[in-house]
């Protein structure tokens, strides 16, 4: 009995050490795969629309085109942000009707490290900036001019995903008025698409 009792703790310790080594191995493998997944994602892209990289350059483009800057403040751990990105902002960014024509759309990851050029050219930390703007409750959507000033009501959270694009249209029209831009969007993306098609059809064809 004494021999058996003396061997059990030793066996347990060896097994425990083996499990610890396996756990450390799996943890290292997990973080390696996570790092690879992050590095494999295109730089400056969040999901399917662009991550904000330079406020100063974006502000210059906004002033030149008289287009509002639309920023969605989000984070990797925010499930509602992912829903909003996938169902609303990614289709708007990829559809060809909005980016550079109706607005300048960017994602602002408040959990991203480092700094970017601010509207004044000075280093800007996204997390600190979000806190200062009161946009650290994600998702929060802001409408800014080329100087970084809010020019339309912000949208905090998601009240109704089906009506969200119409809400963006409404706020964009408010922003256009502040910017002196005569552009006005109809209530829905479908009507906006029809509007663009009608404008294209009314343009004179190029002569051969």
PLM region descriptions:
Residues 4-24:
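Bacterial N-terminal signal peptides that target proteins for export
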Residues 22-32:
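Bacterial N-terminal signal peptides
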Residues 35-39:
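Boundary at the C-terminal end of the N-terminal hydrophobic targeting segment
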Residues 50-68:
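A short beta-strand-turn-helix
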Residues 65-78:
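Short active-site neighborhood of thiol/selenol oxidoreductases, capturing the structured segment around
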Residues 67, 86-108:
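Conserved helix-turn-beta segment immediately C-terminal to the redox Cys motif
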Residues 75-89:
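Short, thiol/selenol-centered motifs that function as redox-active sites or metal-ligating centers
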Residues 131-132, 136-177:
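Non-catalytic, surface beta->alpha helical segment in thiol-disulfide oxidoreductase systems
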């Amino acid at each position: 009995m004494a021999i058996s009792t003396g061997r059990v703790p030793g066996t347990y310790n060896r097994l425990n050490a083996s499990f610890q080594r396996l756990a450390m191995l799996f943890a290292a493998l997990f973080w390696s795969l996570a790092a690879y997944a992050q590095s494999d994602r295109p730089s400056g892209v969040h999901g399917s629309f662009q991550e904000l990289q330079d406020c100063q350059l974006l502000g210059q483009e906004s002033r030149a085109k008289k287009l509002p800057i639309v920023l969605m403040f989000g984070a990797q751990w925010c499930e509602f942000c992912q829903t909003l990105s996938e169902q609303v902002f990614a289709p708007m960014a990829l559809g060809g009707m909005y980016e550079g024509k109706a607005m300048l759309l960017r994602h602002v990851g408040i959990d991203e490290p480092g700094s970017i050029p601010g509207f004044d050219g000075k280093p800007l930390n996204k997390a600190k900036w979000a806190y200062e703007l009161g946009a650290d409750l994600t998702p929060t959507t802001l409408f800014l001019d080329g100087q970084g000033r809010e020019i339309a009501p912000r949208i905090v959270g998601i009240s109704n995903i089906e009506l969200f694009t119409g809400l963006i249209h409404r706020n964009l029209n408010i922003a256009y008025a502040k910017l002196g831009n005569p552009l006005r969007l109809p209530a829905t993306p479908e009507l906006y698409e029809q509007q663009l098609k009608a404008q294209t059809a009314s343009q004179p064809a190029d002569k051969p």
